[in-house]
Amino acid sequence: MKMLGKYAGFALAVALVFFAAGCSKSESDTINIGGIFPLSGDVAVYGVECKKGIDLAIDEINEAGGINGKKIVLIGEDDEGKPDKSVNAFKKLTTKDKVKFVIGSLTSGCAQAVTTLAQAGRVIQIAPAATSPSITDAGDYIFRACFIDPFQGTVGGKFATETLGAKRAAVLYDIQNDYSVGLEENFVKAFEAGGGTVVARESYSTGDKDFNAQLTKIKNAAPDVVYIPDYYGTVALIARQLRMQGITTPIVGGDGWDGLSGNAGDEVLNGFYSNHYAVDSEVPAVQKFVSSFKAKYNSAPNAFAALGYDSVYMLRDAIVKAGTLDVASVRSVLEQTDGDYVTGHLTFDARHNPVKSAVMLELVRSDGKLTSVYKTTVNP
């Protein structure tokens, strides 16, 4: 019995060695990437579309052989657009799943909530669409794929004066939302620098549904353009009440408007917004992406899909050039990014903010459907 036990123990030990070796090989054949997005909640359309773009990029890369022979596996988490849930998702991804690369989250508040954790843990975080300037302040492991609010607000102000010829602007913004405040401040600076006058500057709080008091003041100020820097759900409500008040002037906003096409009506016509790319662009790389996205999902990709797609390819390019999965090495290469992506040519400044152009889109009716079409490009 003792001899049998000895051989049984030896056999078990050998089996465990081979099992461990098999697990190690399996794990080494993949690169796990964490993803944090709002797949439910008020801004779910951002997360759902961004994840589609990420999934498409991963499928393409894996079908082409992966990264240095390793297949990418996305481990996605839904944060519902809530910062506390972003933190929980990040902790789960980095402690349980042991990921060292995270794409997300999308809104500025949610992305900001995990930056200090990412920096402290030396986890590369790429925020696809978080435009608040402070996102990358946490340190050198934090990156983003999008332009930032000061540039976006400036684009809106320049467009209003130079393209629309506006002289009198009114602004209606969410005083509790960093994104909205950031765009508003920089729009005002650019509009006034362009010779315009801000005749009304009204605010509201997150969650408000009735904007008639502010809109009455705006109407009485007689602006020839109204700037509304907020997310599509709130913008749809404001635009409806604005038009019901008889305000027919053009309305302008930022990339938070992406999503209006499926959530608003004719009240947003004569509306223009800054965005990261135009789906109707004739650039070959854009059309290839759009064609592949439509083939996979039977719908056109919005900017969040494009930014998610670009985030994966930015990371892929850095890992390939680094020739290793060592996070510090990948970070160093990522800092030197200089390439063409769906949302434009991209390099990083010293704070890891992309230096890239923006487009202005116009909301129109086409074949009976509300859609966004390219209007103009504004360079940094």
Model-derived features: where do they sit?
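Short, low-complexity disordered leader/linker segments with a strong preference
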Residues: M1-N32, E63, T377-P380
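Beta-alpha junction/loop-to-helix N-cap segments that form part of ligand/metal-binding clefts
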Residues: K25-S26, V45-K52, A64-T136, Y204-F211, ...
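Extracytoplasmic "Venus flytrap"
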Residues: I31-G53, E77-D84, L106-T107, L172-V181, ...
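Hydrophobic alpha-helical segments within soluble ligand-binding/sensing domains
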Residues: S86, A145-R168, V181-L183, D210-N212, ...
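An alpha-beta-alpha
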Residues: I142-S203, V225, L315
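Extracellular/periplasmic bilobed ligand-binding domains
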Residues: L183-S274
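Extracellular/periplasmic periplasmic-binding protein-like sensory domains
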Residues: A239-Y309, L363-V364, L370-N379
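Segments of small-molecule ligand-sensing domains
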Residues: K296-A305, R316-L370
